[in-house]
Curated annotation (Swiss-Prot):
It comes from the Bacteria. Belongs to the UPF0145 family. This is UPF0145 protein GK1405. HAMAP family: UPF0145. It comes from Geobacillus kaustophilus (strain HTA426).
Amino acid sequence: MIVTTTNTIEGKEIEEYLGIVAGEVILGANVVRDFLASITDIIGGRSGTYESKLAEGREMAIKEMVNKARSLGANAVIGVDLDFETLRDGMMMCIATGTAVRLKS
């Protein structure tokens, strides 16, 4: 499955647009991890804990989006966009959206 942020795929022709697909993931962060991450942020370092959480959320959201595209008969997802939102109580939401398409063979 080709997944791209562009609206076209060089050298490929889109046979059919199958619709918008999305993958949503909500992840929680615990108090101890938040505390340690805040210490890292205060002393000026990067927060590896949150960076890994962001990467995990991104991968899970893309995987869910791809699964939905496959169920529509797609072999590619174009125009992919990723959004991250902070929710209350230490929750984080990652959303991957794109357009499921079938490319000509």
